[in-house]
Amino acid sequence: MVSRVFVLVLMLALAGCGWHLRGSMPGMPSLDGLAVSVESVFGDGDLPSELRRQIARTGAVVVPPRAGVPAMRLLDEQVERRRVSGARGAAEQEFDLDYTVTWELIGADGQRLAGPVRLEQTRSLIIERDDLLGSEGREELLIEDLRRDIVFQLVERLQVLAGDALTEDE
C-alpha cells in the first residue's frame, strides 16, 4: 500500500513540475501534414538523416528539396576535441567535445525565416592511456548523444517557427 501511494505521489510530482520525456514536447505546434525538406551543404551523413527521421516523427512529410517547400538547411557541422587537463604523457587526459551545427530555415517562398543560427553542445570526455579502444568508443557515444541533442533542438525550433508562420497566415 505504501509503495502505491509513493508511486502516485511521484507521478503527480513529475506531472506538476513540467517534466517530460525527451522527444515529447507538450504544447508545441503540430507539424502534421507540413511538407518540409532537409538540405545539407556538407553531405548526407548522420546528422541530416537523423534530422529527417525526427521531423517525420512529428507528423511532417519530409520531401526532397524543391521550390515551394520550406527547407531546413544545414550549413555546417563540426566536432572539436579540446584538452582541458592532463599532460601529454599522463595516464588520463580530460577533453571537452564541442559539437556545433549552423543552420537556417528557408520558407516556401525562398525567403530566409531564421538564421543562420549556430547551435553548440559540449560534453566532457576522459581518455585513459591504458584503455584507448574503450575511450574511442566512449567518444563515439558522446558524439551520437551530442548529435541527438542538436537534432532535438532543431526539431523544436522548426515546430516553433512553423507555429509562428501558421498563426501569421490566419
PLM features: what roles do these ranges have?
Residues 26-28, 64, 111, 117:
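Short secondary-structure boundary/capping segments
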